Amino acid sequence: MAAPSNVFWDPAGHLHTNALHWEGFPRLLWESLRSFLYTEPPQYDAVEYQDEGVRRCRVRMTIPQHPFRSQWQPIEVDVVGHRIVDTIEGAALEAIYLFCNQHPREVVGQPIGLFSTTDPNDPEWNLRVVPEGHRLEDST
C-alpha cells in the first residue's frame, strides 16, 4: 500500500509533496524503494519562478537515509524545468538513475534495475552506440 499523499503549499510558495497521488516516476521510485525496505517516501519541494520572463520550476527531492543500511546515504536531486508536474517527474527519474548507479548489485533482477546506469561520456558506452550509425549510412 502506498503512503498517503501529502500535498501542501508553505507560506513562501513552495509545494511540498511525496507525489504519490498520481501514476508516474514518483510512484515507481517509491514502489522500488519500498522493495528495498525504505519506510519513508521521497519528499519533493517545488517552487515556480520567472527567469528573464520565462516561467520556470525548481524541484528539490530527497530520498531519505535508509532505515537500517547506514552505508546507503540520502540521495538529493535538484532539477529545473518549466512546470511543477513535469519537473517532479524529471526529479524522480533522475533519482532512479542515481539509485541504480549507487546500488548496481542490489538492483539486479529488480524492475528498477532495467533503467540505464550508463554515462554517455563513457567511451565504452559510446562504442555501444556509434556502431549502430552504420545502418543508416549504408542504406543510401
Language-model region placement:
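Contiguous, small/hydrophobic- and glycine-enriched helical/loop subdomains that border
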Residues: 74
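N-terminal segment of the canonical double-stranded RNA-binding domain
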Residues: 1-71, 82-85, 89, 93-140
